[in-house]
């Protein structure tokens, strides 16, 4: 028994030594396996997507298109309020999305803008698009961020020419529409006839069978209700929000390395220029090295300094943004609208954004009248050229050419409204021109 006990103790000691030796190997092996499975560096071929490390969020990206004064901005205001975007202490005004002075004065949307709401644990990114054809350059690029569209139509006027223009762009991109017939509280309105006109318009624009099988919502954004029957007003606009969740598809998350296209930009006096766009593949995180692929194919190495997503009307800093979401990126130098943010080691560019050519031109020159310098502070040709160059960075539908005179520039735009807004903006900023 004593000999058996001694032999057992020697065996136990040997087992302990073997286990101790294997322990270090096991830790290293398991660590390598975990890295392989989850691929922390984002962009490899692990067994599971790296996004499993984060809470995946259900997202809907929807653009709202409408003719001028059909109630689009008012509807967005109601959606923001319905989703309790504002705290009890905040004073909620009107025309929240039209925060540009000229937009409020003229009652039109000039610049495409982004906001988001949360409803039933779903994040809905709202893309507000201009309704006037002169601002089609804004429309064409921001529609690429959407997976569906709300087609807002006046119950009395029906679909108008500008509705046709924007809707044709949305249908060509394969976006599925939800038709919202607004202002059913108007006297002598004909909602059923308007719905038939919308169907005829879509058929004329070569909509697919799936696009023609659209859902219709009736209501009054001003009164704050939406429902399936215009004769029976509801209490709120939740019927519309439920339809968005049900019929607008979730963003497709294709396999592969990072791809994000810059579709608009913002500016902050603290961080400079901010790139805004949608992530089509993989994900982004703060500090991640990336490649910026330019329109001409040139590749610039860079790194993400800050990431922001939209929460209501504001931007919120985050550490990580998943595929399908719309975000703002800080830290990129020399980017342009249409550039692709992609993986640093395996850069893959997205197709460039196509914008229709300008249709008219206007001569911009210095003020050489007797009242030179009386109203503005930027009066030289250099000032005017620098301002036009700045506008070219964000206004894709604009084109500027030099003339034989150093004091005159030929500016091409999409229409009278397009160029008139630019002139008025420059005048208010202190530029003198004629």
Regions found by a protein language model. Name each.
Residues 2, 17-18:
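Polybasic, lysine-rich low-complexity intrinsically disordered segments
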Residues 11, 43-46:
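Residue-identity detector for glycine
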Residues 30-31, 35-41, 48-434:
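Structural and coupling elements of P-loop NTPases
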């Amino acid at each position: 028994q004593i000999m058996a006990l001694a032999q057992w103790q020697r065996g136990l000691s040997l087992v302990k030594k073997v286990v101790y030796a294997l322990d270090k190997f096991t830790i290293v092996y398991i660590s390598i396996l975990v890295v392989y499975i989850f691929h922390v560096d984002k962009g490899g071929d692990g067994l599971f997507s790296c996004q499993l490390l984060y809470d995946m969020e259900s997202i809907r990206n929807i653009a709202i298109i409408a003719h001028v004064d059909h109630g689009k901005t008012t509807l967005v205001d109601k959606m923001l309020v319905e989703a309790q975007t504002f705290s009890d202490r905040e004073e909620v005004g009107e025309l929240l999305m039209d925060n540009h002075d000229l937009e409020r004065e003229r009652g039109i949307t000039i610049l495409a803008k982004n906001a988001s709401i949360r409803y039933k644990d779903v994040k809905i990114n709202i893309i507000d698009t201009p309704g006037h054809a002169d601002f089609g350059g804004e429309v064409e690029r921001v529609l690429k961020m959407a997976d569906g569209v709300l087609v807002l139509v006046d119950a009395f006027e029906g679909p108008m020419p500008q509705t046709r223009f924007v809707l044709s762009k949305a249908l060509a991109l394969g976006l599925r529409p939800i038709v919202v017939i607004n202002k059913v509280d108007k006297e002598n309105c004909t909602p059923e006839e308007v719905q038939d006109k919308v169907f005829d318009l879509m058929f004329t624009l070569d909509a697919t069978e799936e696009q023609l099988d659209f859902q219709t919502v009736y209501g009054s954004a001003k009164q704050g209700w939406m429902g399936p029957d215009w004769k029976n007003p509801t209490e709120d606009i939740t019927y519309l929000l439920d339809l968005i969740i049900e019929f607008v598809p979730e963003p497709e998350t294709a396999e592969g390395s990072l791809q994000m296209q810059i579709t608009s930009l913002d500016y902050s006096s603290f961080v400079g220029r901010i790139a805004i766009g949608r992530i089509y593949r993989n994900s982004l995180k703060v500090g991640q090295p990336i490649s910026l692929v330019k329109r001409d194919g040139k590749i610039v190495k860079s790194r993400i300094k800050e990431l922001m997503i939209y929460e209501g009307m504001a931007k919120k800093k985050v550490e990580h943004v998943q595929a399908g979401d719309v975000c703002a990126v800080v830290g990129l130098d020399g980017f342009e609208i249409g550039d692709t943010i992609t993986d640093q080691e395996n850069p893959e560019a997205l197709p460039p954004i196509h914008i229709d050519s300008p249709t008219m031109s206007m001569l911009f020159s210095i003020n050489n009248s007797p009242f030179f310098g009386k109203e503005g502070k930027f009066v030289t040709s250099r000032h005017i050229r620098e301002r036009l160059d700045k506008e070219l960075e964000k206004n894709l539908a604009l084109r500027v050419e030099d003339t034989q005179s150093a004091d005159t520039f030929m500016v091409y735009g999409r229409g009278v409204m397009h160029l008139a807004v630019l002139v008025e903006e420059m005048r208010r900023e202190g530029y003198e021109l004629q």
